[in-house]
Amino acid sequence: LSPAKRYVYVHNDMSSLRKQLEHATKYVATTGGGILVVTEGVFGMAGDLGKLDEITALKSEFNFRLLVDDAHGFGTMGPTGAGTGEHFGVQDKVDLYFGTFAKAMAGFGAFVATDEDVCMSLRYTMRSQMFAKSLTMPMVEGAIKRLEMLKSQPERREKLWTIAHALQNGLKADGMNIGITNSMVTPVYLSGSVAEGMQVVFDLRENYNIFCSIVVYPVIPKGQLLLRLIPTSMHTLEDVKYTIKAFKNVAEKLAKGEYNKELLIDASKL
């Protein structure tokens, strides 16, 4: 929606970002305006982290503001759960911090933390905000309470990391490909058609009581499937063991061709 000139750098590639910053710096020198670098704190599909320490280090060479979408990092990353910026020790160098109430806060809605003048500008000029409804009071009160819990009950976050590490290490030990995640987001990469992927997800939900989301082409290459698991602090190590076993079972069935490669699930039979 922005009319601004856009430069795209290769995912998490700092040399690519540097080149784009050089181009952007030359551009704004002739047109005026400023530079805004945008990244995720935790990338929602693969679970890897944006290199916020390396990005903010470039501020010593280039004049730009940094916007971090930390939907998956807020509440889980950093010593106090303040997010990926805190994890890297550069939270004070993030100019616009975006978070959501829909992940760690188990609600809905979102927020932007920034300087007051920028916040006021967004409030009155951002298209998605102009005619939006306010959050309901129960949601606001619930978010405040959950924020208090995040701050006063660090054991919940510690339990979450225990569960996440157990799940990820267990999946890898059983030969599962979970990519390069180093966050709570736990992707499991499999090979198969979209139809097979739909049946795997259906099988997990109906026969193993495991709900997970599926990501298919064009988000990932054709012939690949990404099943995304999100552990919580309410899960137990027994849940983890059960999940690992279930994924091993469906992966074996997929490899044997037991899921139909072409026919989609007949919704009338669900």
PLM feature spans:
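A common structural junction motif
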Residues: 130, 206-211, 247-255
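Active-site C-terminal subdomain of aminotransferase-like
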Residues: 62-65, 72, 77-182, 189, ...
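Conserved PLP-binding catalytic core of the aspartate aminotransferase-like
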Residues: 153, 157-208, 217-224, 231-233, ...
